[in-house]
């Protein structure tokens, strides 16, 4: 574990302030749930909690079913990384940090569909992950809501060459409905 050299005191209500630099680096937002662990050496460990982690196997099976039925690659993400995928290399994408653009889409709390080409003649693409070598782009994505909170998203994705063909047609109705259904279903599973 890397030592940061920052010391904080606990206030009379038992609160500890996590420095802004650490929150920014670890992508900890206001209101994010944290798990608290202790060990035998007297350490207190804070770990980001992802509600989707309870459904990783289930989300993977759902993504696999969508891929087999409809033929488009699917990724399920929490607020930080890709947690399940089908139709794309799991080794290449699982546990990879989502791109800043995907994070903003999740924050936006609404359906995203790729626009294809913009008015300047250039393509507007949203990469799935931060890794430029793994060129996979969102065709459509829907945030997953549970009890009013956004906890991630389900996305139909495509590699660079297939992205243009899929978005130029403008016929994304099927993908959109299936992705919306998947997001709603996974959200309901977490509420149950």
Task: Name each model-derived stretch.
Residues 138-145:
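A short, aliphatic-rich beta-strand micro-motif
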Residues 85, 92-130:
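Regulatory sensory and allosteric helical modules in signal-transduction proteins
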Residues 63-74:
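Short regulatory alpha-helical segment in sensory/regulatory domains of signaling proteins that mediates
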Residues 14-26:
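Short beta-strand-centered segments at strand-helix junctions
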Residues 73-86:
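Short hydrophobic alpha-helical segments used for membrane anchoring or interfacial signaling
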Residues 56-65, 96-99, 152-192:
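Juxtadomain coupling helices with adjacent low-complexity linkers
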